[in-house]
Amino acid sequence: QTIKKLSSIPKSPNDQRQYLAITLDNQLEVMLISDPTTDKASAALDVYVGSSNDPKEFLGLAHFLEHMLFLGTEKYPNPDEYQKFISDHGGSHNAFTSLNHTNYFFDIQSGFLESALDRFSQQFTAPLFNADYVEREVNAVHSEYTAKVKDDGRRFFSAIKKTLSNSHPY
């Protein structure tokens, strides 16, 4: 595999961490950060797809898929495997869907990073999308939506969207 180093990363003189940005053969851009003062390791993946990409007949699809990716893979079919592995090794995980991005992330005790990355990457390369969890996750996404629908920032953005042309993506 060929790795292409990207340009250097600007940082504060007080920042003792080491940074390396690379592009893999598959065009995945990766930023590596080394901090020897911590006992944790972490990873994140940002996908350039969010709620603005939802088809009109399937609003909430990006958020729904965010939920479904956590629920088992071909290699790790148990829907609780990823969460259990991360929490059993002192870590946490989460994800969020925004207008143009969906971001998945975790942290874990550094000695378990490689195994965690294997589980993490399987969610994107071989998810199960088990039909047994569809209704539950549709309800979870809907519940999150109804809990946030009255948020002033969201209401403001919704009002702005109403003034835009119907052909505008936002």
What are these regions (language model features)?
Residues 42-107, 150-152:
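M16/MPP (pitrilysin/insulinase) zinc-metallopeptidase core fold and M16-derived inactive scaffolds
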Residues 71-75, 107-140:
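M16/insulysin-pitrilysin zinc metalloprotease superfamily fold
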Residues 1-32:
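Proteolytic maturation boundary segments
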Residues 34-36:
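Peptidyl-prolyl cis-trans isomerase
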Residues 142-148:
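Short, conserved secondary-structure transition motifs
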